[in-house]
Amino acid sequence: MRILTLFICTLFTLTTSAQFSKPRREYVEYLISTDHIDRNYQTGQPAYVKLQAFAGGVPLENVYVHYTHGDEMMPLSTGDSILIQSGEALIPIGTRQEPGFRTCHLRFTVDGKEYKDIVKVGYSTESIRPVIPMPQDFEKFWSKVLKKVRSIPMDVEVTPMPQYDSPSVKVSLVKIVCGENGRSIYGYLAQPKKEGKYPVLFTPPGAGVKKIDPILNYAEMGFISLNIEIHGFLPEQSVEEFKKLNEQYGSYPRFNIHDPHTYYYKDVYAGCVRAVDYLCSLPQFDGKNVCVTGGSQGGALTIVTAALHPRVTCLAPFYPALSDMNGFLHGRAGGWPKFFRDEKTISEMEGASIEEAVHTLSYYDVVNFAKLIKVPGFYSFGYNDETCSATSIMSVINSVSAPKKIVITPTSGHWRFPITNMESILWMKEQWK
């Protein structure tokens, strides 16, 4: 009897699991588009967001979609709702009289589950210009900084890390002295095991005080690559140890913001230049090709490094941070870390006045480095980025006079599609001499 019961239970389980297998797609699906396929408009043109929504493949009917819209990263000025009929709703989101972006937030509910999304559209984006000034002594300032840091021996320490090796790539932990009082950076050097001469690739990190891991895929594609951390903390520490460090140092973008000569990013920018100096000193370097790539803060440091180091031959920044950082003081979206956005961010300036902070940031803003770029670049971002505003990113791209390939994926936010990432790598390889 017990065996028969077990057999029946097993049969029931197999039958029901076949009947109720996991769905291969969502019951409610929706697609967002705009009446201009590239989401670009001229100033003064009205824009419309089109929502198409289905439940089990059947167009939704008589469901309200609620929406708000306004200028990018500004208080959303208009809100309303519209009925989805025959699976579609057309949402008017207004226009702009000045170049920039507008944002629409929308949401709707089906069977108690809420669905929400964001869409941004651009207006005369090729005409967006930075608002932060470029100091007259900008280049002189950085020439002095680099002259001083290069007078300090790098005293490089290289430690083989075979536990990270792949069949074709060897990995080493590198420590580079890049400032006074032993100020250092750490990074992971990944080199093809096959003997030969190779292009070098520098990959600065995104924002935060966090653990980094070796990156092997660039070396597997024929680069000698170095990915670094910028704070001088040994990356072999645990995630828990880095969480504690982040609690202490996480607000570093504001450290010493009152003075450009002591601002935290001075050593960071100089450290990136020294990292490229180190890569160019390697005997396996082909002597010709020096590439830089990164995203967010890494995108910013990519542009800074390419502007400051004469041996860089191409760059591929994604959604650069630290760009047009005083935008909010001019009534438009600024770049990460969103200085001056509101009273809270202004109160977090480590005691610096707005005037002092703006003066300091003018020496560190990426748009001013972008004006100095002389080599080809691959620039990519998505309109829906809520970390690094599209307005600030376009102010950077429009400041570059050197040859540039611009790849925009409007639906992406503060991330990129794998295919775009691969496109950037292949593009860099095309620049090899």
Where are these predicted regions, by residue range?
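Cap/lid segment of the alpha/beta-hydrolase catalytic domain
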Residues: 210-270, 327-330, 334
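Proline/serine/threonine-rich low-complexity linkers at boundaries of modular beta-sandwich domains
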Residues: 19-30
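N-terminal cap/lid segment of alpha/beta-hydrolase-fold proteins
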Residues: 35-39, 149-195
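Gly/Ser-rich "nucleophile elbow"/oxyanion-hole loop immediately N-terminal to the catalytic nucleophile
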Residues: 251-295
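Short beta-strand/loop motif that positions the catalytic acidic residue
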Residues: 373, 379-381
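C-terminal catalytic histidine-bearing segment of alpha/beta-hydrolase fold enzymes
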Residues: 387-433
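Hydrolase active-site cap/lid region
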Residues: 299, 303-350, 408, 416-419
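Surface-exposed, short loops/turns at beta-strand junctions within beta-sandwich domains
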Residues: 94-100
